[in-house]
Swiss-Prot record:
Keywords: ATP synthesis, Cell membrane, CF(0), Hydrogen ion transport, Ion transport, Membrane, Transmembrane, Transmembrane helix, Transport. This is ATP synthase subunit a. F-type ATPases have 2 components, CF(1) - the catalytic core - and CF(0) - the membrane proton channel. CF(1) has five subunits: alpha(3), beta(3), gamma(1), delta(1), epsilon(1). CF(0) has three main subunits: a(1), b(2) and c(9-12). The alpha and beta chains form an alternating ring which encloses part of the gamma chain. CF(1) is attached to CF(0) by a central stalk formed by the gamma and epsilon chains, while a peripheral stalk is formed by the delta and b chains. The chain crosses the membrane at residues 18-38, 76-96, 114-134, 166-186, 193-213. InterPro entries: ATP_syn_F0_a_bact/chloroplast, ATP_synth_F0_asu, ATP_synth_F0_asu_AS, F0_ATP_A_sf. It comes from Streptococcus pyogenes serotype M1. It is found in: Cell membrane.
Amino acid sequence: MEEAKIPMLKLGPITFNLTLLAVCIVTIAIVFAFVFWASRQMKLKPEGKQTALEYLISFVDGIGEEHLDHNLQKSYSLLLFTIFLFVAVANNLGLFTKLETVNGYNLWTSPTANLAFDLALSLFITLMVHIEGVRRRGLVAHLKRLATPWPMTPMNLLEEFTNFLSLAIRLFGNIFAGEVVTGLIVQLANYRVYWWPIAFLVNMAWTAFSVFISCIQAFVFTKLTATYLGKKVNESEE
């Protein structure tokens, strides 16, 4: 059997996984389309799609209120909402269909089922919270937090690294495992024709459970982002 080849694009020293890039673009398009559709023709008394959008915004605002000072919460509400919606859509993207090449390579997976993507997303969050910490509190005050108390400086730096790593691995582990189990259930249906009804029912139940877990992971990711951000920008953390 011919070995499956992953579509790649090389631009100078950087190599892009075209499959991952494509599903990321699809994720962004879905998020944009949903917000654009739900925010059209908004009314003073919300109903239908507007109610759903406002509920999501209020839900994410509640996360920010728990971890950010009141005067800062509104400044980051849109960021947290975007992160939550993006991760929620990305987590669920690979659950509902499968697109394989003749070599057996799956072209349609959740972006968050790719460890490199999760590490990049986690790195973005880590850099963002530190940049915001410097912008809000100043470089000296920001570095002072990492060195207070000074004997704990190595542990504080280690904590920053473990926060970055755990944010990515937690997301990857849950989403990747969900897609693996979904693939095994589909293989069960292909094994024998009389297994198909059982596999169908099991797959429906597992998909519903996976959607729930994916949304929980989006919530956890957003909550941890708000937590890390609050530690860097809140005046109460002085």
